[in-house]
Regions:
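Cleavable N-terminal signal peptides
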Residues: 8-10, 20
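Bacterial N-terminal signal peptides that target proteins for export
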Residues: 1-8
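Beta-strand-enriched cores of mature, soluble protein domains
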Residues: 21-145
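N-terminal signal peptide c-region/cleavage motif recognized by signal peptidases
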Residues: 15-18
Length: 145
């Protein structure tokens, strides 16, 4: 009986910890607006370059490589890098890994980053390749230790 009680208490503590560390997707940690500055088309994928201001990160410069996983190029994988030049002169560096979907000229890019400062973010970009405008939101899922 004591073992069952211990298992139940452990399960409740695990559930409470999981809920407590859940990310509230209705409240992003920050937002930003980027501009697509270059698009390079290749036989196996497309490279896009971006720059613009992002809340808490100063000016961001990023490159993403999009590779389709289907014939109509409506979804696929994203890999990339970003450099953020902070307002105090510091720099944050991070790789990007995720997925994308496309509908017409609209791209939705979803990825995680793992910054050199120890912060991990989940990031969503809504981009239009015709207007070259990108709006983004990010959620901090792991803060600095």
């Amino acid at each position: 009986m004591n073992r069952l009680k211990s298992v139940v208490i452990a399960a409740v503590l695990l559930a409470v910890t999981t809920v407590a560390s859940a990310v509230d997707m209705s409240k992003p940690t920050g937002t930003g607006t980027l501009t697509i500055t270059n698009i390079s088309i290749g036989s196996d994928g497309t490279t896009l370059d971006f720059e613009g201001p992002v809340e808490n990160y100063g000016t961001v410069f990023a490159t993403h490589y999009l590779q389709s996983v289907d014939g109509d190029r409506a979804r696929g994988i994203v890999t990339g890098q970003a450099r953020a030049m902070l307002n105090d002169g510091g720099m944050v560096v991070t790789p990007h890994h995720g997925t994308f979907t496309r509908s017409g000229s609209s791209l939705q890019i979803y990825f995680t980053d793992a910054t050199n400062t120890g912060v991990v973010n989940f990031v969503v970009w809504d981009a239009d390749v015709l207007t070259k405008k990108v709006s983004l939101k990010y959620w901090e899922v792991k803060s600095v230790d």
